Amino acid sequence: MTEYTPMIKQYLEIKDKYQDAFLFFRLGDFYEMFFEDALNASQILEITLTGREGGTKEKIPMCGVPYHSASGYIDTLIEKGYKVAICEQVEDPKTTKGMVKREVVQLISPGTVMDERGLKAKENNYIASLYCYEGKEYGFAYSDLSTGELKSTVIEASEDRLINELTTLSTRELIVSESEKEVLSDVMKEQLGLTFSVHEEDTIPAENEKLVTRHMSLSEKRAIGKLLHYLKETQKRDLGHLQQAIHYETSNYMKMDYYSKRNLELAESIRGKGRQGTLLWLLDNTQTAMGGRMLKQWIDRPLIDRKQIIERQDDVSELMAHFFERLELVENLKNVYDLERLAGRVAYGNVNARDLIQLRNSLYQIPRIRATLLSMNSKSLTALANQLDPCEELTEKLEEAIVDSAPISIREGGIIKDGYNSQLDTYRDASRNGKTWIAELERKERELTGIKTMKVGFNRVFGYYIEVTRANTHLLPEGRYERKQTLANAERYITPELKEKEKLILDAEEKSMELEYQLFTEVREMVKDYIERLQKLAKSVSEIDCLQSFADISEKNHFIRPTLSEDGSLHVKQGRHPVVEKVMGAQSYVANDCDLDQNREILLITGPNMSGKSTYMRQVALTAICAQVGCFVPAEEATLPIFDQIFTRIGAADDLIAGQSTFMVEMLEARNAIVHATKDSLILFDEIGRGTATYDGMALAQAIIEYIHENVHAKTLFSTHYHELTDLEKELRGLQNIHVSAVEENGKVVFLHKIKEGPADKSYGIHVAELAELPKSLIERASRILEQLESNDKKIIITQDKQPEEIHEEVQLSMFPVEPEEKASSKETKLLKEIAAMNIMQMTPMDAMNKLYELQSKIH
């Protein structure tokens, strides 16, 4: 074995325990990295790669970052999905003989970030854990370490359900056992793009048993235990801010899978991957960071409980009715800092004096917010006001102890107010009097020597000194001034009197700073006693902030309060797409009605490309979501059912599953909706069948419509270019044709974006191609071909009894020569039998993809 130096041996011993992390190894004022860590980090962080003697013939690769600026480099690594183990010197080098002892004091990973600079103010930073129970169910737990939130549930052991939970939470890190990680498919791991951490221990630490309630299932407790044990092992500090685990049921909220949320652009735009242009972007006028985080949670999980929805609507109504009080409320909320994350930093022990000032200033606002809510004389808002705990004793303590303009550092003094501690006042008086004496000494020495430029200064290396320019040194009396330091143009001296006073001043300052730090830590420890109360307060303030945001947005955008229907019917008069309207401007947007009930379950939408079919469909879904989060909706009138689920297949999703064709994605998403939808669900299907041959696509589209009509009875909006399908209105009682109107003016098509009853008479596809400025000769050729096709066209419609009303005499032409069929090989026969034996309706979309990969590998 290579004989490394003692320091490198120490590094390797520690690194062996943290193989999946970059080890930041403290050497003096730097964090150093060696070997593979150095090679990789130098490229990722764009820092210089050097070498260090380590006992080998060749230098060991090394790179490093300054200790005082390491946080920026750590943030970069974490943002890219890496982990960083912070290894500190845990002994004083001055008092230690030989090698200084070093230990990892914290493992920072994407899910355990606590530094404010590494967190997004209005986004949670979730870490989750998984426990698979006998392959039947997943115990699932998650936490935001920065806020102390801890929740858990039990979900079906399917990758689709797991993906939905992880993506709903925007999870940064998932803790699994080695066996659980192996079970999860590579497709899922790539799709999620999160950091996986392997951890086996799943017993709940003794000090955290109070966080778990008795009624929780075994799998749920194991998931919580795995999460808590991992956090304890990696963070190596008090986690007293973690709240009691709250059990939640996914069935208590409207369900939307990842693809539906992305298609509807609820919190992330498809193109920009940011908030701009999303429903969250539109509805977010929250004034606090914690309010912004709660708003995203509300949008991610719309309510299905009628009572809860109406309660939120009542609060929004009251806030809208009190305009001036709401303005006052907004001003108060602007001065409330992030109480959740402040409480987290207090528990972590990395809070500074400025954080405590922010806490104090936030608590000042609570009585004002409470008074404003009470002044509205609203029963619902009074209940909210009474939940606000001003923590008066804490406010008084912080006011008494901490100065208003405290420094960031907590070890250099200037934090504690005069009069708070008598001993501190004594030290400060000694220091201040000494400094007054210093100022007087400078005046006397100038008079004595006649040197007007003489000054008394101080630095940490040499202490106090008298500085005289070299040109004036001859004026100094002999024997009284002792030279202390020589500069280029001056000399620095000390006198016996100055030396004596210096000791008194510096002793007083040192003792003062030590006592200040002690007093500050006492205040900080006292704040820990209020963490639970602060977390409850933060939740109440966040809720108020979300409700005022709904009121503000509803008023500014002319939203109205929807009525919740009892019979499942949907009637929207002059509805608008809230986001498109905001981007375009209210004057430009064309509003439309939408009506769905028991006799009108499916709307079959036809009309030209670019006419607004997809926008209309999204508009209906977003209106429902707005209503079920408790907000008002963009319409003149609205009566809405409470949807239990929303399923969408609306364009722009072809890239969602790596390696899958458009048609495969269509079929997977269609299957997901058809199998899981109920009569209380909403289905949006845009151009189903477009990814395959015309007759194949049309046949599938018709079969899907019929299946939904006969078996599912979900409210459905189905857009299509297959105009033959409009004849289904004659066969299916619950289907109604509607179309997006367009007119021709002077040979040009004008899209009116208006929904009308009945089918569209033309598709205007060639006009759209003309708008795209395809070559004129190509457009003319397409027009001639269209005329020929239309003259030979016969409609095909297969009725429910499977008897064709009219069947085209010619089959669809192939683009390629048709080869005579050959007898299938034994290998192909086996594959065909395997495919025939598959129960497609019992497969999840993810199961279907994995099976397809398996079949492909057998072919190749």
Swiss-Prot record:
Keywords (A to Z) from UniProt: ATP-binding, DNA damage, DNA repair, DNA-binding, Nucleotide-binding
Domain of life the protein comes from: Bacteria
Gene3D superfamilies assigned to the protein according to its UniProt record, in alphabetical order: 1.10.1420.10, DNA repair protein MutS, domain I, MutS, connector domain, P-loop containing nucleotide triphosphate hydrolases
Positions that bind ATP: G607, P608, N609, M610, S611, G612, K613, S614
GO cellular component: cytosol
Pfam (any one): MutS_III
Xref: SMART domains: MUTSac, MUTSd
GO BP of this protein: mismatch repair
Keyword Nucleotide-binding: yes
Family annotation (PROSITE patterns): DNA_MISMATCH_REPAIR_2
GO molecular function ontology, one term from the record: mismatched DNA binding
Family assignment from sequence similarity: Belongs to the DNA mismatch repair MutS family.
Role: This protein is involved in the repair of mismatches in DNA. It is possible that it carries out the mismatch recognition step. This protein has a weak ATPase activity.
Protein name per UniProt: DNA mismatch repair protein MutS
Organism: Listeria innocua serovar 6a (strain ATCC BAA-680 / CLIP 11262)
Gene behind this protein: mutS
